[in-house]
Regions:
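A structural signal for short coil/turn segments at secondary-structure junctions
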Residues: 38, 74, 163-165
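His/Asp/Glu-rich metal-coordinating catalytic cores
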Residues: 55, 85-221
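N-terminal active-site segment of His-dependent metallophosphoesterases
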Residues: 1-68, 72, 170
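Hydrophobic or amphipathic alpha-helical targeting/insertion segments
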Residues: 75-83, 102-103
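Residue-level recognition of the N-termini of beta-strands and the immediately preceding loop/turn
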Residues: 42, 77, 166-168
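Glycine-rich beta-strand-to-loop/alpha-helix junction loops that act as flexible
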Residues: 45-48, 80-83, 208
């Protein structure tokens, strides 16, 4: 099974009051062509679909058309929300569009969502961890001591039964310690949003978003 991993589309972004939507539309067409040429079975979109939590109608229409083209040949699409997105907005109609092969992380309810895919030799489980602030996790898991982003993610992962007999992929939109940043990301003061990569050791592949530079962290997969 072949996966195409992307993130941080930031649809609707402007530069000096100039809309980038025409350029973004051209890039999305290229991505669809890459997915077709590489015969990708699924596409992983790891957060920050939109530039704003309340995206303009044109940006939403562009993303809708993009996803529709991706799934037209039976391809699966997995989407999580990032720090720029509104989880309720991203996940609107999520239960309905699952029938089309589009899986969107819903607003956090205390557990992490997953989808199991059948492959030729072993099942593949795709886990979806949207961007979560410590306060969001604390609200759902009041018994946990949560002060940092790492505390929050670890609390969620402790409640996640990852089966090592299966192949496990995680979509995640957080800042991972050791990643190389560019000048376009939003960071928390003092590095409070840092999460150590070792917390994800149970997963075979972690599809990261949030950092606007392709890279590998700790290990090759």
């Amino acid at each position: 099974m072949r996966f195409l991993h992307l993130a941080d589309l930031h649809l609707g972004k402007q530069m000096n009051d100039l809309s980038l939507l025409p350029d973004q539309e051209a890039v999305l067409r290229q991505i669809v062509s890459i997915a077709d040429d590489e015969k990708a079975d699924a596409v992983l979109i790891a957060g920050d679909v939109y530039q704003r939590s309340s995206p303009q109608a044109e940006a939403m229409a562009l993303f809708d058309a993009f996803v529709s083209r991706l799934v037209s040949g039976g391809r699966k699409v997995f989407v999580i929300s990032g720090n720029h997105d509104s989880a309720p907005c991203i996940s609107y109609f999520s239960s309905l569009i699952r029938a089309s092969g589009v899986y969107v992380s819903e607003a956090f309810d205390g557990t992490m969502q997953s989808v199991t895919l059948e492959d030729s030799d072993r099942e593949i489980v795709v886990w979806m961890l949207p961007f979560l602030r410590p306060s969001q996790v604390k609200r759902r898991l009041p018994e946990e001591k949560i002060a940092t982003y790492q505390d929050a993610v670890e609390a969620v992962l402790r409640r996640t039964a990852v089966d090592p007999a299966k192949r496990n992929i995680l979509l995640c939109h957080h800042f991972i310690t050791g990643s190389e940043t560019s000048d376009s990301e939003e960071r928390a003061v003092g590095g409070l949003d840092n999460i150590d990569a070792s917390v994800f050791d149970a997963f075979d592949y972690v599809a990261l978003g949030h950092i606007h530079k392709p890279q590998r962290i700790l290990r090759d997969t």
